[in-house]
């Protein structure tokens, strides 16, 4: 894929509770775009409040993709995200619209934007049964013990993945069980060639402001029925599913079981959310070339104006005969 034929897309990233949904919808309205969720948990049906899933009213008529596509007990990976998102980008671009990726799952977005060489992990049915049995055996381990198990055969991946990121730890273990190769070894040979002509926008603010927003959003989620949502998922038999290790769900299950108080669970939920936001910022700042917009200094309109400026500035540096032109902002 040459530079002149790369489709243009806008990517909006940032930590949890930073306002990605609101900005992405306004950008879509202004630039004739459609939105692809870049959140690893919003793919799951019935997990709405805890994942801060955009509502129909909030969409304001803007098409959204990669939301509510799987049951809570289904597995989902960066590879699967990449495959599906690529199809949506191709279709959106073909119809003359601008694909907009909005989300906070750094690995998923990075795998889409760059030429990740995912290996074929298909295995025989018997081998898959063995893998599932082993993963089932590991379910009872807490996060630290599971992380120690990963470190026993893949120290590099263990260093790169936080113990509380149970989903990524399990993914690294599953990869090894399937291929007998280390996930860390695969990453070393990745080719970071850009797949798209990307305007990568990030939302930032002071840590104090972000943490206040996170705490407030947790309170709002609880007020909107998060506990009932988690209880319903447990009653449906999804308690042991990988998706239930997401922040907002794993903290409330012990309350349902009568193991901890709601007060303690809420404090843990807020703490885990703040820690996750910190990890998100570290990922985006270290691994991606993001143009940051400060939410404390800029209004929503100022952000839109800056995005317009960036599009025009980038357009002036490219041949106007590109196959997939950026949206014109001359009449906006």
Curated annotation (Swiss-Prot):
Keywords for this protein: ATP-binding, Magnesium, Nucleotide-binding, Transferase, tRNA processing
Location of the region described as Disordered in the Swiss-Prot/TrEMBL record: 312-332
Pfam families: IPPT
A Gene Ontology molecular function term of the record: ATP binding
Residues the entry annotates as binding ATP: 14-21
Region annotation (Interaction with substrate tRNA) ranges: 39-42, 167-171, 245-250, 278-285
A single GO BP: tRNA modification
Marked site: Interaction with substrate tRNA: 105
NCBIfam families the UniProt entry points to: miaA
PANTHER family: TRNA DIMETHYLALLYLTRANSFERASE (PTHR11088:SF60)
Family: Belongs to the IPP transferase family.
Subunit structure: Monomer.
Name the UniProt record assigns to this protein: tRNA dimethylallyltransferase
Origin species: Staphylococcus epidermidis (strain ATCC 12228 / FDA PCI 1200)
Species lineage: Bacteria, Bacillati, Bacillota, Bacilli, Bacillales
Gene that encodes it: miaA
């Amino acid at each position: 894929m040459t530079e002149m034929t790369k489709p243009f897309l806008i990517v909006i990233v940032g930590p949890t509770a930073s306002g990605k949904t609101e900005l992405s919808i306004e950008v879509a309205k202004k630039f004739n775009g459609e939105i692809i969720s870049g959140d690893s948990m919003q793919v799951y049906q019935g997990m709405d409040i805890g994942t801060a899933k955009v509502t129909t009213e909030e969409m304001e008529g803007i098409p959204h993709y990669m939301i509510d596509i799987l049951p809570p007990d289904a597995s989902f990976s960066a590879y699967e995200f990449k495959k599906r998102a690529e199809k949506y980008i191709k279709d959106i671009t073909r119809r003359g619209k601008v694909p907009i990726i909005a989300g906070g799952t750094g690995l998923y977005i990075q795998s889409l934007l760059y030429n990740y060489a995912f290996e074929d992990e298909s295995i025989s049915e018997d081998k898959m049964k063995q893998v599932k049995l082993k993963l089932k055996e590991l379910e009872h381990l807490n996060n630290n013990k599971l992380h120690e198990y990963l470190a026993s055969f893949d120290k590099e991946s263990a260093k790169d993945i936080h113990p509380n990121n149970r989903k990524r730890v399990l993914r690294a273990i599953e990869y090894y069980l399937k291929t007998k190769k280390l996930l860390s070894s695969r990453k070393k040979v990745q080719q970071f060639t850009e797949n798209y002509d990307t305007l990568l926008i990030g939302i930032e603010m002071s840590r104090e402001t972000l943490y206040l927003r996170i705490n407030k959003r947790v309170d709002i989620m609880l007020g909107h029925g998060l506990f009932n949502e988690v209880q319903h998922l447990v009653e449906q038999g999804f308690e042991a599913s990988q998706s239930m290790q997401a922040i907002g769900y794993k903290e409330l299950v012990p309350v349902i079981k009568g193991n901890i108080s709601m007060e303690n669970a809420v404090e843990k939920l807020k703490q885990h959310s703040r820690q996750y936001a910190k990890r998100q910022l570290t990922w985006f700042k270290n691994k991606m070339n993001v143009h940051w917009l400060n939410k404390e200094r800029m209004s929503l309109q100022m952000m839109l104006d800056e995005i317009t400026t960036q599009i025009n500035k980038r357009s002036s540096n490219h041949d106007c005969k590109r196959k997939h032109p950026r949206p014109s902002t001359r009449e906006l």
